[in-house]
Structures are given as structure tokens and as C-alpha cells.
Amino acid sequence: MKVLIVALALLALAASAASSTSGGCGCQTPPFHLPPPFYMPPPFYLPPQQQPQPWQYPTQPPQLSPCQQFGSCGVGSVGSPFLGQCVEFLRHQCSPAATPYGSPQCQALQQQCCHQIRQVEPLHRYQATYGVVLQSFLQQQPQGELAALMAAQVAQQLTAMCGLQLQQPGPCPCNAAAGGVYY
């Protein structure tokens, strides 16, 4: 019996020690679980958009294809500022076969035309020259396929007179309904 009293006393002592560390009320408080930490990325900083200053714009104009420069692959380019002197050269019938070819006016127009052809990118010279020649032919005497064949020959002669070689690229991505010409 003494053993039982000693055991109960030890239990009471252990219980009182536990109650003094757990808040003093004699009961244990349930453990408080914090939610897992929430990860928040650091704030993302975007610098303010700056408009380019006028002096920062490129000074070179974008390179245009002959379709963009001359419209419909050169057809309809009679008013084109790029080969306007060639139009005049053809309009005055200044060609090796024509009699006024040796006139001073034809020689001046030829020089100006050659200068303008040299300004066209080499890959696009044939398309540009052909388009101007064809348009000139069609305005004078619309002959369809025959005019197209003659225009090809004259375009080659014209560039040869200027001392230039032609590079004949593939067809221009224009359609015939828009007045385009397939070579």
C-alpha cells in the first residue's frame, strides 16, 4: 500500500510539473500549426517606355522590292520617279534602231536613264527596266504577248547600252489580275 501511495504521489508531482509548463491550466494546448510560408517573388521592375528621339531614327530608307517600288512588278511605273528618264528615253523613241538615237537630246536622256538604272538594286534591275519598257510599249500600241517579248528584248538592250549586266530573278509575287507580269 505504501508503494501505491508513493506511485500516486509521483504521478501527482509529475502532473503538477506538466501543468506549470503548459499554461498553468492543467490541460495541454494543442499545437498551433502555421500555414506553409507563401513565396512571393520580388517585385518586377519595368523601366518606363521611351520614345526614340528623332535623331535616333534610321537614316536609310528600307529596301523595297520592285513590286513595292514600281507597283505590279514594274507595270504601271511610268510615273515612277526611279526610272522616269528611261520613260522619256523610250517616249522619244531613242533606241539603237531609231534615227534620232544620235541626237544630243537622246544622248542626255540615255545618260540620265543609265544613272537611274544604276540606282536600282542589281537583283531588281531587270524587273524594273522590263516593267517600264513594257508599260511604254503598251501605251503606244497594245499588242499583249508581242509587246511583252519586245519589252524583254528592249530591256536587255537598254541595260546593255548602260554597260550593265542583267540578273533575271524569278517571277515577282504579283498576280495577273492586279496587272502583274510573269516573266
Swiss-Prot record:
Keywords: Repeat, Seed storage protein, Signal, Storage protein, Vacuole. It comes from the Eukaryota. Coiled coil: none annotated. The keyword Repeat applies. The keyword Repeat applies. Residues 1-19 form the signal peptide. InterPro entries: Bifun_inhib/LTP/seed_sf (IPR036312), Bifunc_inhib/LTP/seed_store (IPR016140), Glia_glutenin (IPR001954), Glutelin (IPR000480). GO terms for cellular component: aleurone grain; vacuole. It is found in: Vacuole, Aleurone grain. GO terms for molecular function: nutrient reservoir activity. Zeins are major seed storage proteins. Interacts with OP10 (via N-terminus). This is 16 kDa gamma-zein. It comes from Zea mays (Maize).
